[in-house]
UniProtKB/Swiss-Prot annotation:
Its main location: cytoplasm. Residues 208-243 form the UVR domain. InterPro entries: GIY-YIG_endonuc, GIY-YIG_endonuc_sf, GIY-YIG_UvrC_Cho, RuvA_2-like, UVR_dom, UVR_dom_sf, UvrABC_protein_C, UvrC. It comes from Francisella philomiragia subsp. philomiragia (strain ATCC 25017 / CCUG 19701 / FSC 153 / O#319-036). This is UvrABC system protein C. The keyword DNA damage applies. Residues 20-98 form the GIY-YIG domain.
């Protein structure tokens, strides 16, 4: 059970004694869950406004009714307050805040910390751990395009460390002058670092400076009669100037724009972000959100904070930002905080004209198109949820569905997958897999029993059981889940249902069984609820197959090494520690394997032969 956190909190006294400093406030419900995070210049005035008389939208009224406790944090500046607010929203995702769902993390270009660093791209919040980051980039295609350009200009390695360490002669990239071959010692540390320094300036957007520096180095090398070196610099200049003419690289730094368009309809909103360089759209991204009770200004405020302040390692910034028409005074403080983070002023364009207006209209058209697709898809999904609710004869709306599927390879490497769907759609971040242990090979019934038991046990502890649990299988599988439900006494808390292929084993002809009901049900193959059941089941099946294949692959590679005489647990561990995994080991050459402590040249040869 979750404790009631409202008992010792005196709201009236708290409001009366609030500070007038700037800071962040958090509103919590009776369970201690943060339901809203806000930032205020004057905490006393802002927080009290929620509880004073006056016109409020229905969403705010509903939120205030649930407030059982308020916590505050005083911030030394508006900038610090915005950062804290953003971090708390990302961490807790309060249900009454405007939330932006990013299906994937932004990609970064990363220069590694190796002696001879490699340049690559990495997606994720921990990109900074890999090395020096440049970004974020809006899309994978834009970061890959930049990598291709880099490879043509700067002969910095892009290969994986395992490949780099195993080289005994230069690869093709050296032959076509796209790498300096540090792997085999064909370049000095000083020469490599020089190219690396110019590359970093290039990635930081200092293109004019890069041109000047390379040009100066070319003339200096020529004067020193280092003609081969001068030729390298000349080739770099030729490519850079060609790119400049093609407007692939933005040499005129003041011609970079971010354009943010918002389109609202009913209780939904869509935000389109276009990135413009020299008159071309080079990247775009979209967000669609539930905007009930919000206006365009509050959505713009939330988005600017999310996109520009929410990423601690961002170091690529536009010179100009064009915005949809909003109440400028309400976002001025946020604009100043963003400029403070950058360390320089941004040109905010809130009343665009001419070409700038053309870009804004394009962004708003994109936002409208994406919202139409989003609302259509959402409407279809809601119809499926309602249909499933009706079929299962549930009183309450379905908020969370989980589905289990079992996968194994000839009885081995058994995996149970659990996929999650909410009332918003598939929740990929909540998907998980269970390694099934201590059962008879190929025993799907025992596997279902174990997986469901583990999920129910953790769900009761965390108070996050689903409304509906789907089992991929027929009567035998659902009976195993029923046994678990009886054991934990949750027969009336979670609706159990299974989807079996039946005798015909044809998609669309599946048999449906409800928990603790021996009746065999069938639905029309176009029934919305039936379509949802199959959609969730198929997702669970795919998730299980992927996990099972990974496990089989890992087991196979591990067993290959185990068969080699002289490679025991200690040496296997040493190999994995050195290469980072079986896949990297399989790519290594004999001389590289022999570098591992305890591995002789003869043993290294045997290990190499196992993989080839």
């Amino acid at each position: 059970m979750i404790a009631d956190n409202s008992k010792d909190f005196d709201l009236k006294s708290f409001l009366a004694n609030l500070t007038t400093h700037s800071g962040v406030y958090r509103m919590l419900d009776k369970h201690g869950e943060i339901i809203y995070v806000g930032k205020a210049k004057n905490l006393k005035n802002r927080v009290n406004s929620y509880f004073s008389k006056g016109a409020k939208d229905s969403k705010t009224l509903m939120m205030v009714e649930q407030v059982a406790r308020i916590e505050i944090t005083i911030a030394p500046s508006d900038y610090e307050a915005y950062l804290l607010e953003n971090n708390l929203i990302k961490q807790h995702r309060p249900k009454y805040n405007i939330l932006f769902k990013d299906d994937k993390s932004y990609p970064y270009l990363v220069i590694s910390r190796d002696k001879f660093p490699r340049v690559s791209f990495y997606r994720g919040k921990s990109a900074y751990k890999k090395g020096q980051c440049f970004g974020p980039y809006v899309s994978i295609s834009s970061v890959k395009n930049t990598l291709n350009i880099i490879q043509k200009i700067f002969p910095i390695r892009q290969c994986e460390n395992s490949y780099y360490k195993s080289r005994v002669r230069p690869c093709l990239q050296y032959q076509i002058k796209r790498c300096l071959a540090p792997c085999v010692g064909l370049v000095s540390q000083e020469q490599y670092d020089e190219q690396l320094a110019i590359l970093k300036k290039f990635l930081a957007g200092k293109f004019s400076s890069v041109l000047e520096e390379i040009s100066a180095k070319m003339y200096q090398a020529s004067e020193d009669m280092e003609y081969e070196k001068a030729q390298v610099y000349r080739d770099q200049l030729v490519i850079l100037r060609k790119l400049q003419q093609q407007q692939i690289v933005d040499i005129q730094e003041d011609k970079t724009f971010d354009v943010i368009g918002i389109y609202m309809q009913d209780s939904y909103a869509s935000i389109a972000l276009l990135q413009i360089q020299n008159g071309d759209v080079v990247a775009d991204r979209h967000w669609s959100i539930d905007a009930k009770g919000q206006d365009k200004t509050s959505i713009m405020h939330a988005f600017l904070s999310h996109f520009y302040l929410g990423d601690e390692i961002r170091n690529i910034w536009p010179k100009n930002i064009i915005l949809s028409k909003v109440e400028f005074a309400d976002i001025t403080d946020l604009m100043n905080s963003i400029s403070q983070k950058i360390g320089q002023a941004i040109n905010w364009i809130v009343a665009p004209a001419a070409d700038n207006l053309k870009w804004l209209k394009l962004a708003e058209v994109n936002a409208r198109q994406k919202l139409n697709i989003y609302t259509s898809s959402k409407s279809q999904y809601q119809k499926r949820l309602e249909s499933l609710k009706e079929f299962l004869e549930l009183e309450k709306d379905i908020k969370r569905i989980e589905c289990f599927d079992i996968s194994h390879f000839q009885g081995e490497a058994t995996i149970a997958s659990c996929v999650v769907y909410t009332d918003e759609g598939e929740d990929r971040k909540s998907h998980r897999r269970y390694n099934i242990k201590d059962i008879k090979a190929g025993d799907d019934y025992a596997a279902i029993h174990q997986a469901v038991s583990r999920r129910v046990s953790s769900g009761l502890e965390a108070d996050n059981l689903p409304d509906v649990m789907i089992i991929d299988g027929g009567k035998g599988q659902i009976h195993q889940a029923e046994a678990v439900f009886r054991e934990y006494g949750i027969q009336d808390k979670v609706q159990l249902v299974s989807l079996g292929k039946g005798v015909e084993r044809i998609s669309g002809k599946e048999k449906i069984y409800k928990g603790f009901d021996d009746t065999e049900y069938t639905l029309d193959e176009h029934n919305p609820g039936f379509l949802l059941l199959r959609q969730v089941r198929d997702s669970a099946h795919d998730h299980a197959i992927k996990g099972q294949r990974k496990k089989v692959s890992a087991n196979r590679q591990s067993s290959i090494i185990e068969e080699i005489e002289g490679v025991g647990p200690k040496r296997r561990k040493a190999l994995i520690m050195y290469f980072g995994g079986w896949q990297e080991l399989s790519r290594a050459f004999v001389d590289e394997i022999a570098k591992v402590k305890g591995i002789s040249n003869k043993l290294a040869q045997e290990i190499w032969e196992c993989f080839h």
